[in-house]
Amino acid sequence: MDVLVGSTGLIGQVLREAHEFGACFHSKNIHEAPLLKEPIERLYLACMPAEKWKANAAPLDDFDNMNSIIQNIRHLPSPAEVIVYSTIDVHGQTAYYAGGIPEIFAIDYGANRYIFEMLVKAAFRDSVVTIIRLPALFHRFIKKNILFDLLTNNNVEKININSAYQWYCLDDLWKDTKKAISGTTNQFFPAPIETAEIIRRFFPEANVSSGPRIEYNIGTYTATRYETMKKMEAFINAWH
C-alpha cells in the first residue's frame, strides 16, 4: 500500500491526481496515522507547510509543527521506501550549488526543512529514503506566490522586481518523482528566471516595487529558461 501524508496541500493535491493512495493523512487526521497497521510499500511525505513567510516569522512554531508531524509518522509500519518532498531553500540563496548543504543556513524556513529531512531518515532507518527538492512552483492549485499574486492582482506593489527564481511546473511532479525513485536525480532546479523578465513578457502593466536583491541560482539545471518559460506561458494562458 502507498500512503500519502500531506494530502490537502499543494503537492499532496497534485500527487492525488496522479496516483491512487491506500491511505491519505492531513493536518486534521494526522493523529490517526500511528493506528495504521497495514504494510506500507511507499510513504510519500508532502506534509511540511510551504508558507515561507510564516515559517520565517515564527521559526520555533514551525519547528514545533515539524516535530509534531515526525512524532505522528514515526510509529507507522516501516515502509520499504520513503519519499520526502522538500525545498531548494535547504541550500540557502545566492550561490551556485555543486556539492553539499551549506553549514550555515540563510533562512529558518530552509533550516527547518533540512532538519525534517534528517529526522525522517532517522525515523525510518530501515527504509530507502529519497529526498525530492523543488524550487518555486506553478500549477493551477497554487494559492500564494509571485505568479499567483500577478494573476490575481493581489499585493502586486509588494513584488520585488529585483529578483530571480528557479521555477518548476508541478505538472511534471509525478514523472519526476519516478525519476527520483529510480535514482536518476532528486533535485529539480530549472535555470533561474528574472522576475523582471516574467513581468515584461506576461504582466507589462503590473506596478511592482524594487528591493534588495533576491536570487536563486542552484544547479545543475534540469531545464532551460526557455523550456520553463514555455510551460509558464501555457499555465498563464490556461489560468485566464
How should each PLM-predicted stretch be described?
Residues 106, 114, 118-174:
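NAD(P)-dependent short-chain dehydrogenase/reductase
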Residues 1-25:
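N-terminal Rossmann NAD(P)H-binding glycine-rich loop of SDR-like oxidoreductase domains
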Residues 45, 82-84, 130-136:
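Structural signature of the Rossmann-like NAD(P)-dependent dehydrogenase/reductase core
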Residues 174-219, 223-240:
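Mid/C-terminal beta-alpha module of Rossmann-like enzyme folds, strongest
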Residues 21-37, 46, 209-211:
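A short beta-strand-loop structural module common to alpha/beta enzyme folds
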